[in-house]
Amino acid sequence: MAQNEGIPNGTLSAMVIDEDKCHADSTCSMICTQLNFCVTVFTSPIKALDFLQNQAEGVHLVLADVQMEEMNGFEFLKVARELHKSIQVIMMSTETTIYTMKRCVQLGAQILVKKPLDVVTIQNLWQHLDIKVLKMEKIKDMLQGVGDKSTCANEMNSFPENQKDGTKRKYYLMWTPHLQKKFLHALEILGEGQISLMIMDVDNIDRKQISTHLQKHRLQLKKKLSKASFTKGSNEDTSNPSAKNHLTCRTMTLQPHPYTNQPAETTMQIHSEDVEHDDVYDAMRRALQDGTAFDESKYSSDPFSNEDEDVVGDGYADKANAIDSSGDHYQVAVVLTTPHNVDYTQEIMNKVTTSDDVQVTRGGKATVSRLVDYSDSDSD
């Protein structure tokens, strides 16, 4: 049997579902007296579900028994929550075990209370209810009879759900990877000038948020480009062989020939970038053997003649600068420069002085010593 089936507008309503009619009636009277709720009592859970299916929006609180023969209380709770998701259900049971409490909470119940209910329990029921939902439901019921229904509905929908103390809460947009992918896709289609909301096809996003994110995107691109250019420049400096000028200096001391009467000591330093042609080798060898200067202008057709070549001295030493302490020895300086490889320079010098004794000191500079004698009368 159902009591007070007609729920009047403007009041909070409750339902009591219990197969024990005496307990259901006593609970109904205490709720009406203590909480001033309009209560509907059902002894059949099936009829209670039929009532909820037709008038689920008008019920704010449901008290249901767990141990019912016609339908288990857990099944009733599950179906009631499916019919009305915001409905608040309080379960009643003679056994308040941990399992029963956990099961009720998992299915969406507010709390499990022990039967039979007393006045103190009824008075404390409101502490377990969502008062905000109850107030909103009451306001909606009160506004149904005032003004146009469509106007009231629009005003209620415009109210923020999380409104507190009359201040509107500010929401922040989080750019998830999915939103970032849509943003980049729209950027490819339209470019950086404009991004259309229709292309992104995302709700709850405005142009201001898109423009702000576009500015951040441009700043990130600038940082990445500057970092990439700096890294590329540093790699080129370290990997470019021509970035550094490597100088290998060799000093050649020509020792006196054993068959000459008047020995003359000649020191030669050779500067050259890269010489590989056989004609150049032969000319250098002849110049060293004859004690004359090496003229590089005769070999301008050499493929490596574009490199800087510097010959110091003319084969006949200047007396103001080249005469040593003995007064009869001459010095001619020719410096040979090879990039990067000291061993390669050593190979060239070995080809030039194959028939003579060579003494080499390795390090930052290599020194080759050889003495050649020639008479002053031959040079005149």
Swiss-Prot record:
Post-translational modification: Two-component system major event consists of a His-to-Asp phosphorelay between a sensor histidine kinase (HK) and a response regulator (RR). In plants, the His-to-Asp phosphorelay involves an additional intermediate named Histidine-containing phosphotransfer protein (HPt). This multistep phosphorelay consists of a His-Asp-His-Asp sequential transfer of a phosphate group between first a His and an Asp of the HK protein, followed by the transfer to a conserved His of the HPt protein and finally the transfer to an Asp in the receiver domain of the RR protein.
UniProt entry tagged with the keyword Nucleus: yes
Transcription regulation in keyword set: yes
PANTHER family listed in its UniProt record: TWO-COMPONENT RESPONSE REGULATOR, TWO-COMPONENT RESPONSE REGULATOR ORR28
GO-annotated cellular components: nucleus
Phenotype reported upon loss of the gene: Dwarf, narrow leaf, low tillering and altered kernel color.
Family: Belongs to the ARR family. Type-B subfamily.
Biased composition (Polar residues): 228-245
Role of this protein: Transcriptional activator that binds specific DNA sequence. Functions as a response regulator involved in His-to-Asp phosphorelay signal transduction system. Phosphorylation of the Asp residue in the receiver domain activates the ability of the protein to promote the transcription of target genes. May directly activate some type-A response regulators in response to cytokinins.
Matching Pfam families: Response_reg
Name listed for the protein in its UniProt record: Two-component response regulator ORR28
GO molecular function terms listed in the Swiss-Prot or TrEMBL record: DNA binding
Span of domain Response regulatory: 13-130
Annotated Gene3D superfamilies: 3.40.50.2300, Homeodomain-like (1.10.10.60)
GO biological process terms held by the UniProt record: cytokinin-activated signaling pathway; phosphorelay signal transduction system
UniProt keyword list: Activator, Cytokinin signaling pathway, DNA-binding, Nucleus, Phosphoprotein, Transcription, Transcription regulation, Two-component regulatory system
SMART domains, sorted: REC (SM00448)
Name of the gene this protein is made from: RR28
Localization, UniProt: Nucleus
Residues within the DNA-binding region(s): 169-223
Region called Disordered, residue ranges: 225-245
4-aspartylphosphate carried by residues: 65
InterPro entries per record: ARR-like, CheY-like_superfamily, Homeodomain-like_sf, Myb_dom_plants, Sig_transdc_resp-reg_receiver
